Amino acid sequence: MGHSVEILVPAQRYVFAIENGHAEPQPASTSAEGFKIFKRLRSEGKVAGMVAFPNCCLIRAAEDYVVDPGIIMQGAPTSSSLSARGIEPHTIKKVILTHAHFDHVEALVEFPQREVLVHELEVEAPYTAFLQGVLDMVKIKKLSGDEGEIEPGLRWIRTPGHADGLISLLIDTDDGLVVIASDCVGPLPEYFDEMSLPEDFGPEREELLRQWQRIRELDPHMVVPGHNPPVVLD
């Protein structure tokens, strides 16, 4: 019997714009719509801020793993979502971080003293310095190299571009291979659908396209991006 992947808290974006002299929220029904609003407001010089929830996932294997707990506001919903599945949050022993950007890490405060698997390049990255208080609450297990196995049927590969130590998780399920690609895939779903990024996307453009091709060649049943709904490919 294969493992399973479930979304505990789905991705969403909350964008704020300067309107009438103060910050106002801009409603969006999906994370992708929120990103388009953000791009438009940025071009108009009206962005006041954006908060982005990543997909927080549960992998059910020989052990249960929480993947990318997310920003601090996701902590309570994640715990409630686990409880609704009959899993008490205190029974979760291991958490996996695809990378160590703050929007994927903050809610680790819900899982103190757990073993946290994260690539060593992320632990050493300068942006983790202001998260040190959170990381000090857990037991870091550094992953190294370009690939590895966490347990049979649960592997990881390094997929840099968005972050040098970003890993994608490869999970064997009864429906086929599921890839939790995190922020390797995004920020809009049509980019991955079309395997194309705007020419002015940024310095990571070519690396991301290489990683997308690599993911496609794995022939996955489903890909879970960081900030968009899962994509079923067959």
Stretch-by-stretch model annotation:
Residues 6-10, 57-60, 145-174:
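Core dinuclear metal-dependent hydrolase active-site scaffold
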Residues 80, 92-103, 110, 115-158, 164-234, ...:
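Metallo-beta-lactamase
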